[in-house]
Amino acid sequence: MALAHILGYPRIGANRELKKAVEAYWKGDIDQAELERRGQALRAEHWQASRDAGLDFVTVGDFAFYDQVLNVSAMLGAVPPRFGAIDGDVDLDTTFRMARGRAPSGTPAAACEMTKYFDTNYHYLVPELHAGQRFRVASTRLFDEVAEAQAAGHPVKVALLGPVSWLWLGKEKSAGLDRLTLLDDVLSVYGEILERLAAQGVEWVQLDEPALVQDLPRDWRQAFESAYNKLQSAPVKLLLATYFGALGDNLGLAAGLPVAGLHIDTVRAPEQLDAVLDRLPTYKVLSLGAIDGRNIWRADLAALRERLQVARARLGERLWISASCSLLHVPVDLDAETDLDAELKSWLAFARQKLDEIVTLAHLLDGRATPEDTARLEAATSALDARRQSPRIHKPAVGERLAAVSADDAERASPYATRAKAQHRHLDLPLFPTTTIGSFPQTQDIRAARRAFKSGELSRDDYEARMRDEIAHAVERQEALAIDVPVHGEPERNDMVEYFGELLDGFAFTRFGWVQSYGSRCVKPPVIFGDVSRPGPMTVRWSEYAQSLTDKPMKGMLTGPVTILQWSFVRDDQPRDATCRQIALSLRDEVADLEAAGIKIIQIDEPALREGLPLRQGEWQEYLDWAVKSFKLSAAVARDETQIHTHMCYSEFNDIIAAIAALDADVITIETSRSDMELLDAFQDFAYPNEIGPGVYDIHSPNIPEVEWMVSLMEKAAEKIPAERLWVNPDCGLKTRGWAEVEPALANMVEAARELRRRYG
């Protein structure tokens, strides 16, 4: 009998209950006991959903109040000294301090670095690793949650990030440290954790090792062998979980490790199934990630049943069926989407529906389909046939325009050196010009107005009048602060991707399709279901109005084609690069319209450019080629004197600096404050020719940056980049902060720029 299970479930709740609870706790509106009670209620609800669907286990360990990697760091006692907790238990407040930047005394402390989890839009807190670091079992949270599930009568499988991938995701904080020298001590704690889980009666523990789908140096491959040879004595069965891609040259390594089972991703890498079947020892379970854990399209159950029959025949009782990865990356429940049109809704499956798909597929492969399974199979086949034939998908005019694009369409009229001279004459900005990344605080009043407008309580005219008031306020505050290049603040935008998707054809929107980005931050990705085109201008009137309020050059704000693609649920019936070029052409028209409206600076944000990189370096160039061409296609229509900015956050640039330069943006703003300007090394080594705004303060922390601290960061930047090519700006947009934090932070930033002009002018 094929067993059905999942690697993890969304923890935010169908109505973002987790976000609301955590933020209420941070504000002091609820106490920790109430926060824990709400977390327990969410876990109970999610475990019950698994049982109701018919899964053979509930998965325990996928829940976190902030981040599952942070949970492991806390469990291992891997807390940076500035946050205390050197001995004893690591409590919830300590983990929040690590994430948000506070010392135990309440004074500001640098938050732990945050970066993308492999190639997803989920962000994790990077473990900080030090020479001589001591590890211990420092949290009982996992054991407590196991006891919770058992008390509710659930059969438990524990999910935990594996020891090697935890180290792989970490960062050395001691000069000359090799992370792998810490592995033995980490393994000792993992061994103790597994012993304690066994004592609780846990039979299966899933250890996530997604590092195995990447290019691993020899010493890391050896580390996997060493680690799992040591862990094989643990009195539990280990399921080694790999996902986000193919095992590739690590297949033999993964198949040969002394564990009881292996999970592979057969959505991202269906081609690896036959090779894994050939290499898997006859005693091991093989868990097939056959249902897409990262996208929302309904599974083709008939095709999967046919394709996986060979695995069923060869494995028999050793076959498990699952999603490709944790369902963390998809929304919770499609049933909540009562406003979505019936045809489009029939093409989709969210996390709750994917539980049903997993169970039905297992039943179909076993030949034990229930009437409900048969009905589900027939409904899926019918919906997918309708999707393939729907006239909503393909628009001939879009295809014709795309086919007519030439190489010249992606090139600016003049090289950067020529453009820079024209822009400096046109803009007349000071040394170290100041700007922000685009968004200003989304206040309760703004959110209330948007809700009232969407519910019909507020007319369009009244809503737009309120948004103009908010724009005027943002411009007024920037004028008072003496920001050199203001922005309109984006009060009219609910989300930097969703806003554009609502104004483009080929997109659809959900009401409850939230997924976790980091901590309490959730995003609601648009659904790209068909060909993309722009019916009309999207941002022009807002930027034009903002420009009318100031003599300074107002910066127009667009989200780039690659980021719109990466942060959407993308159609799976054509190559991603084709969809990206369709978006780029729509943005190209917007750039032309902004320029015609008198906007002299246009920012095309691409924070997700690096995120789209394949996990295997051998596949990078193909992706970078089309990603860069898409960006340039959107920007190249601009005249020489129009300055094109781009912004990238949470990015590492060393290995893609040539592609960054190939974007040919006049100014690039990047997140650097958490990395102490280390990211600029890549630009220095590459002799990057254009202008750069290295972020001088971390907007994810509520701390107010000091003037001298920002000056010192910019002085480090000026050692690597000529002062005349440096801008002064925050790391990222200010949407999630409050005005009480933003104004003093920006005032200090402007003062830092003045001091820099005194020193370098």
From Swiss-Prot:
Gene that produces this protein: metE
Active site (catalytic residues): 700 (proton donor)
Protein family (similarity comment): Belongs to the vitamin-B12 independent methionine synthase family.
The EC number(s) this enzyme carries: 2.1.1.14
CDD domains, A to Z: CIMS_C_terminal_like, CIMS_N_terminal_like
Keywords: Amino-acid biosynthesis, Metal-binding, Methionine biosynthesis, Methyltransferase, Repeat, Transferase, Zinc
GO molecular function terms noted in the UniProt entry: 5-methyltetrahydropteroyltriglutamate-homocysteine S-methyltransferase activity; zinc ion binding
Organism: Chromohalobacter salexigens (strain ATCC BAA-138 / DSM 3043 / CIP 106854 / NCIMB 13768 / 1H11)
Residues reported in the UniProt entry to bind L-homocysteine: 437-439, 490, 605
A Gene Ontology BP annotation from the UniProt entry: methionine biosynthetic process
Full protein name: 5-methyltetrahydropteroyltriglutamate--homocysteine methyltransferase
Note on how the cofactor is bound: Binds 1 zinc ion per subunit.
Reaction catalysis annotation: 5-methyltetrahydropteroyltri-L-glutamate + L-homocysteine = tetrahydropteroyltri-L-glutamate + L-methionine
Residues binding Zn(2+): 647, 649, 671, 732
Binding site for L-methionine: 437-439, 490, 605
Cofactor(s) required for function per UniProt: Zn(2+)
Binding site for 5-methyltetrahydropteroyltri-L-glutamate: 16-19, 116, 521-522, 567, 611
Pathway linked to the protein: Amino-acid biosynthesis; L-methionine biosynthesis via de novo pathway; L-methionine from L-homocysteine (MetE route): step 1/1
Known role: Catalyzes the transfer of a methyl group from 5-methyltetrahydrofolate to homocysteine resulting in methionine formation.
Pfam families, per database record: Meth_synt_1, Meth_synt_2
InterPro entries associated with the record: Cbl-indep_Met_Synth_N, Cobalamin-indep_Met_synthase, Met_Synth_C/arc, UROD/MetE-like_sf
